[in-house]
């Protein structure tokens, strides 16, 4: 069972990113850093999905959440300025439907489930991965900012990954 867990570099002038801090602790999984770049992310997603993965877990950080949140839906919209100065102003992602949903069944997860991955690069990356994944199950998980909750977030993320990759899901 080939699984990749990704995280984002810090963005928005912050020195760290909760996704990087937590995912770097997952020693049993292949991990990869993603840039916060509108122009670079599509080719990276293409490269990732060319590796015949069974599962792709995209992990990001959001200050709007106080707890770990699993995103069910990605929307066809981009907004905000990336780390390289490229800005999007509520622009649609070309050639796709209004929204895409994960193929994972999230109904029995004991975590917050959201249908709004935002408009920034988390959503864009998720939308691209869902639209391009043929035989790979993809899901996005947002982490809150880290305070004294690093171990708790790591354990919750591991629980989500293990729950979703069980054969019966």
Residue positions per predicted region:
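N-terminal catalytic or cofactor-binding beta/alpha core of small enzyme domains
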Residues: 1-119, 130-135, 145, 149-168
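Active-site-adjacent betaalpha module
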Residues: 125-126
């Amino acid at each position: 069972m080939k699984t990749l867990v990704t995280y984002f570099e810090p963005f928005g002038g912050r020195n760290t990113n909760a996704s990087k801090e937590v995912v770097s602790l997952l020693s049993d999984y292949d991990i990869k850093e993603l840039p916060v770049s509108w122009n670079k992310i599509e080719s990276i997603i293409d490269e990732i999905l060319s590796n015949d993965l069974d599962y792709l877990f995209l992990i990001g950080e959001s200050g709007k959440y106080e707890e770990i949140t699993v995103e069910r839906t990605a929307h066809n919209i981009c907004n905000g300025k990336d780390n390289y100065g490229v800005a999007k102003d509520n622009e649609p992602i070309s050639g796709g439907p209004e929204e895409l949903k994960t193929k994972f069944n999230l109904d029995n997860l004991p975590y917050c489930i959201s249908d709004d991955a935002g408009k920034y690069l988390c959503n864009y990356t998720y939308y691209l991965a869902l639209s391009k994944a043929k035989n790979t199950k993809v899901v996005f998980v947002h982490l809150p900012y880290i305070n004294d909750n690093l171990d708790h977030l790591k354990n919750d993320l591991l629980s989500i990954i293990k729950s979703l990759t069980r054969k019966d899901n």
